[in-house]
Amino acid sequence: MSAARRTVPTPPSGGQIVPLRRLDERRASLAEISDEALLASCGVGDPAALGALFDRHHAAVYRLISRLLRAEPAETDDLVQMTFLEAWRSAPKFAGRGTVRSFLYGIAANTVRHHFRSSRRRRLAHEGIPEPLPSRAPDETVVRAQQIERLSLALEELPHDLRAAYVLCDLEDLPGVEAAHVLGVRAGTLWRRLHEARRALRDAIEGGTP
C-alpha cells in the first residue's frame, strides 16, 4: 500500500488550510490543543485548526479508507480530502460521543459507502493469475504467502458492511461500542457482522489450505 500523501484540503470558504508544520508561530500552541478543541475551532471556521487535525489524523484515515476500498492511491487521497472537508462542515455536530478519530472514521466510512453507491464501480480486479501449486508439498513460507493472498482476496469479496466491521474491530482495534458508533449501528448488529466476516475469512483460508 502506498503511503498517504499529505495534500491538505482546501476548506469550502476558499482559504487554503495551512499544515501544522508551516505554522511556526502557532506550532507550540496548536500542538497542545486537544483534538476536541481543534474540532470546535473548525466549527467556527478556523482553517489552521483543520490543518492541525489533518496533520494528526490523515495517515490513519488514509489507512482506513485503503482497507475499506482497494483503489489507486490518487483515488484514495481524494476520499481522504472529502473526509476532512466533510469533517470541517460537520464539526458543529460533534457531540463528544467517542473520540475525534472515531468521528473522522465515521465520516470516512460514509464517504466510502457513498462512493460505492454513486460510482457503481466494481472492485478493482487483481492483475495476473496465481501460479499453480507445485506437485511437491510447498514449504511453510509458500503456504503462509498463499494464505495471506486468500485472506486479502476474501476481504475484498466481503460485502461492504461486513468488511467495515472487520476492518474497524480486527485491523484498527477499535472497541466494539466505538466501532458500532462509527458505523451507526447497534452493538448487536456490529457483532453479527463481525462474526459473519470472521467466518467467511476463516472459510476462505481453510478451504484453500493444501
What is each PLM-predicted segment?
Residues 89-96, 106-127, 144:
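Arg/Lys-rich amphipathic alpha helix in sigma70-family domain 2
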Residues 1-44, 48, 52-56, 120-187, ...:
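Intrinsic, short, N-terminal disordered tails of RNA polymerase sigma-factor systems
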Residues 68, 77, 91-97, 101, ...:
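A short, glycine- and basic residue-enriched loop/turn
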Residues 55, 63, 67, 85-89, ...:
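Base-recognition residues in the alpha-helical recognition helix of bacterial helix-turn-helix
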Residues 38, 62, 73-90, 172:
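Conserved RNAP core-binding helix
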Residues 78-85, 98-110:
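Structural recognition of an alpha-helix C-terminal capping motif at a helix-to-coil junction
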